[in-house]
């Protein structure tokens, strides 16, 4: 039997054995794509099993994540730290081989996949990050960032709407180092897809600016390898789709080519028949040493990385500042002066005490942070002028219409010294005259995603996972529903992605209930490991941005107003970052010696409403504390002593927020001023009155709570 056939059959055997032992899983796709994996991993993929985090490795994404045993088998066979015992513990509690691939759980897994269509979209993010980093950091003779992104995807990924968003942007951005291999087996859970999936996939991708190859025999490793080689040679900077006709469950005499191969164990009898059909006489989980030897990539991977290390050493000698900056950014570390930048930004906001919408406050903070952090990569889903995600430091990202290359801004007229070359957007080779061939202008750092909220969110996940950039993107809060599953995936993966959601309430006014967020803040707060901030003025907004940028292990959602918000005077800025703090005590409104009898908790624009109600109550000698709680999720993580200090147990609590009331009762509220219906189309001031968001109603609600 040919070497490639044995290598593929090793995948098939491990897949069917692991699924059978777990009595759970998907053997069909791994068995069908085994030859594709042999071609890619054996002939083309650049990787080192001993160092899954090598900076210039190729990235591989298994978009059809239910085929996880394909990936686990390959990682084990090629020499990653994934043992045969790990394979035997497939889908078991706390194993390194969960049901779907999870980043940071299994060495060699680049992204968490399972929700179909998101993997190929992550891959677009990976490829975009590689292209931008190459434009920023590579210099003549020093192609230090130079790797491909590969993705396997299936019929389900093709059917998901997000795939249309992703491939459209990949074509527009000319991501020539993105190569996708389509497992075209014509089968889904419900059977043969022909009655409900009639797309001409090749023409669809070509219409989006891709090259296509095939259809080819996806069960012929040599044909697949030749197609990959052809794709790698493309000279037009277009991404490539390779259409691979495969047979799901290949090798299984009675299940191959049927939906029965998809999502259940083959059974002991069928596995025995399959072993015979494949001429694989080995016991479950037994792999011949010769097959291990054919698969092993330890030596080749070590050589590949060592060769790159030599080139990087030369690069570091020529451009020490650039090299250090690249390493810092790939590690996800912030600049050493970030804390000072954050402090200055917050203090400036406090000193100016401007009355602006929090979306504008966000842009003001972004001006400071994007100037200090060249890794910030912004964007908007066709709402830049509303989300205000652009800054002076983040011009629009553009690509040359002819070549597809990243368009750079003007190089500096006076070249920087070698000591000043740490900023890749304006570096030179250390010369002192006009720009040299090594000089680079800045790349664009603001992306026009078009009306593609879901695609934007999942692409940002890929960018964050790749490293080198901190992605943020904007849309209206109501449209966060389009992005929700990608937001959830970012939280699950524990990666730094920042979502800017503006027009956060009925305060947007006349556009009406289709655009007015009611349930969205509460809904986002339910996602584990997602920080949600709804700041109430410029200082709180600056703090929210600073915390989001420092948060390397969780994504952040910033909920921002359309309407202007007055600045809330405050004596101490330090506690804002704890998610909630006392913004006003009774003595502020003339009740110095009066005992506090209640606490008003408010978020966002409603903090001003709470402060106005506090004054009305003070006129009646009713002393209330006002607590601003810009981030319930952050406050919930604080120590018990701090929580008690902010929200004393014995005091009645009244929450005020223009949204669903359900999430507030956990704070022991006696009453909540909120909205549990959809909004209305009317000017914002009329809506505030209609829904009871007046100082008078808040004050009356407090009095009513005190009478109980």
What are these language model-derived features?
Residues 313-496, 554, 573-582, 588, ...:
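Non-catalytic terminal/interface segments that mediate subunit docking, oligomerization
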């Amino acid at each position: 039997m040919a070497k490639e056939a044995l290598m593929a059959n090793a995948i098939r055997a491990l897949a069917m054995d692991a699924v059978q032992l777990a009595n759970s899983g998907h053997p069909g796709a791994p068995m069908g794509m085994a030859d594709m994996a042999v071609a890619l991993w054996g002939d083309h993929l650049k990787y080192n099993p001993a160092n899954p985090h090598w900076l210039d490795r190729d990235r591989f994404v298994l978009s059809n994540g239910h085929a996880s045993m394909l990936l686990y088998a390959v990682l084990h066979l090629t020499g990653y730290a994934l043992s045969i015992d790990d394979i035997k513990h497939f889908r078991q509690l706390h194993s390194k081989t969960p049901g779907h691939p999870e980043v940071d759980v299994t060495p060699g897994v680049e992204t968490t996949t399972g929700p179909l269509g998101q993997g190929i979209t992550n891959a677009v993010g990976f490829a975009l990050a590689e292209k931008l980093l190459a434009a920023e950091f590579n210099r003549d003779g020093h192609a230090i960032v130079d790797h491909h992104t590969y993705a396997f995807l299936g019929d389900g990924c093709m059917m998901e709407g997000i795939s249309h968003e992703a491939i459209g942007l990949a074509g527009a951005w000319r991501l020539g180092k993105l190569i996708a291999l389509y497992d075209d087996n014509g089968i889904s859970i419900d059977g043969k897809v022909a009655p409900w999936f009639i797309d001409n996939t090749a023409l669809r991708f070509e219409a989006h600016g891709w090259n296509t190859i095939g259809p080819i025999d996806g069960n012929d490793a040599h044909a697949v390898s030749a197609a990959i080689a052809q794709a790698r040679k493309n000279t037009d900077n277009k991404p490539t789709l390779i259409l691979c006709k495969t047979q799901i469950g290949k090798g299984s005499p009675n299940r191959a080519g049927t939906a029965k191969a998809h999502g259940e164990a083959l059974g002991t009898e069928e596995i025995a028949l399959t072993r015979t059909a494949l001429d694989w006489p080995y016991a479950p989980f037994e792999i011949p040493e010769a097959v291990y030897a054919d698969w092993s990539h330890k030596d080749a991977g070590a050589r590949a990385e060592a060769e790159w290390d030599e080139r990087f050493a030369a690069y570091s000698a020529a451009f020490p500042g650039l090299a250090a900056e690249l390493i810092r950014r790939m590690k996800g570390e912030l600049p050493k002066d970030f804390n000072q930048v954050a402090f200055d930004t917050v203090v400036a906001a406090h000193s100016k005490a401007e009355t602006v919408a929090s979306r504008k406050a966000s842009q003001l903070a972004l001006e400071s942070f994007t100037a200090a952090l060249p890794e910030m990569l912004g964007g908007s889903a066709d709402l830049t002028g509303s989300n205000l995600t652009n800054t002076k430091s983040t011009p629009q990202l553009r690509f040359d219409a002819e070549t597809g290359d990243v368009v750079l801004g003007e190089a500096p007229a006076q070249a920087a010294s070698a000591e000043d070359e740490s900023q890749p957007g304006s570096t030179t080779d250390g010369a002192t005259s006009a720009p040299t061939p090594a000089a680079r202008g800045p790349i664009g750092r603001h992306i026009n995603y078009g009306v593609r909220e879901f695609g934007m969110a999942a692409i940002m996940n890929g960018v964050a996972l790749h490293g080198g950039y901190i992605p943020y993107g904007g849309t209206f809060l109501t449209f966060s529903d389009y992005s929700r599953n990608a937001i959830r995936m970012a939280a699950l993966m524990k990666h730094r992605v920042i979502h800017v959601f503006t027009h956060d309430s009925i305060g947007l006014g006349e556009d009406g209930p289709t655009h007015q967020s009611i349930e969205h803040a509460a809904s986002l707060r339910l996602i584990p490991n997602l920080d949600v901030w709804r700041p109430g003025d410029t200082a709180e907004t600056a703090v929210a941005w600073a915390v989001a940028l420092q948060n390397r292990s969780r994504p952040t959602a910033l909920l921002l107003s359309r309407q202007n918000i007055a600045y809330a005077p405050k004596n101490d800025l330090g506690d804002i970052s704890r998610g909630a703090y006392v913004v006003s005590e009774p003595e502020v409104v003339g009740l110095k010696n009066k005992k506090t009898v209640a606490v008003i908790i408010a978020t966002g624009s409603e903090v001003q409403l709470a402060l106005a109600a506090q004054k009305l109550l003070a006129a009646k000698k009713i002393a209330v504390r006002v607590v601003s709680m810009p981030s319930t999720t952050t406050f919930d993580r604080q120590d018990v002593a701090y929580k008690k200090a902010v929200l004393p147990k014995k005091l009645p609590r009244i929450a005020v927020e223009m949204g669903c009331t359900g999430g507030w009762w956990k704070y022991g509220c006696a009453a909540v001023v909120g909205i549990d219906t959809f909004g209305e189309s009317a000017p914002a001031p009329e809506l505030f009155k209609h829904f009871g968001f007046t100082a008078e109603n808040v004050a009356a609600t407090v009095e009513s709570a005190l009478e109980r």
